[in-house]
Amino acid sequence: MPQEEEAEYLFKIVIIGDSAVGKSNLLNRFTRNEFTEKTKATIGVDFGTKSIEIDNKTITAQCWDTAGQERFRAVTSGYYRGAVGAMIVYDITSKISFKNVTRWLNELREMAEQDILIMMVGNKSDLEMSREVPTKEAQAFAESNKISFLETSALNSTNVNQSFERLLTDIYHLVSSKKPMVVDDTQNWLVPNQGKKLTPLSDPAPQLTANTTSTHQEKKSGCC
């Protein structure tokens, strides 16, 4: 039997932002092509993986959906380690979630690697009649902070794949232009190793307060 094709690059992406902006549905739409009308707030972390082709290379994205609720900030801080990309999500119908992008951006730049690539996503573009955040305002913010920007709808799939694929493509081009990176043995995180196939290390994930699986954890009330 032919061997299953291995990913040539494995990129860890963290999805952050306030609770109820739609992070879990963005993750599920991209990795599983699923959408749940009434999702509940993620406890701890959820993650999913998906492989795509970029320049004839197999790129696997390991996407982590971290809890956006304030009481989980201490938990999520550990998950920035090893991330080469980040998606900061706000809800276009919630001005406060957009204002809080600044806090998430500052936290990300404080805790993550210096050269992490960032995309800001304005989710729920299907709710145009309830919009509180003008597209031009968000675009200007993204440009002033030198980050990418797209508006998406996890409900109808608008720009979901495009947002992840653009971020992954930017990461790939950055990584492939550099010398090989070294695996951080202290954290056992898989990081890009230019042009070489990656094989999982033993126990690749850190200890979590909630068990990480590729499906949702036990959840509490509220929307994510």
From Swiss-Prot:
- Positions occupied by motif Effector region: 39-47
User: Where is this gene product found?
Assistant: Membrane
Q: GO MF annotations for this entry?
A: GTP binding; GTPase activity
Q: Which biological process terms from the Gene Ontology are attached to this UniProt entry?
A: intracellular protein transport
Q: Which residues cross the membrane?
A: none
Keyword Transmembrane on entry: no
Its membrane topology: Lipid-anchor
Q: Where is this region: Disordered?
A: 194-224
Keyword line: GTP-binding, Lipoprotein, Membrane, Nucleotide-binding, Prenylation
Major location (coarse): membrane
Q: Which sites carry lipid of kind S-geranylgeranyl cysteine? A: C223, C224
Q: Which SMART domains match?
A: RAB, RAN, RAS, RHO
What does the sequence similarity comment in the record state about its family? Answer: Belongs to the small GTPase superfamily. Rab family.
Give the protein's recorded name: Ras-related protein Rab-11C
Taxonomic lineage of the native organism: Eukaryota, Amoebozoa, Evosea, Eumycetozoa, Dictyostelia
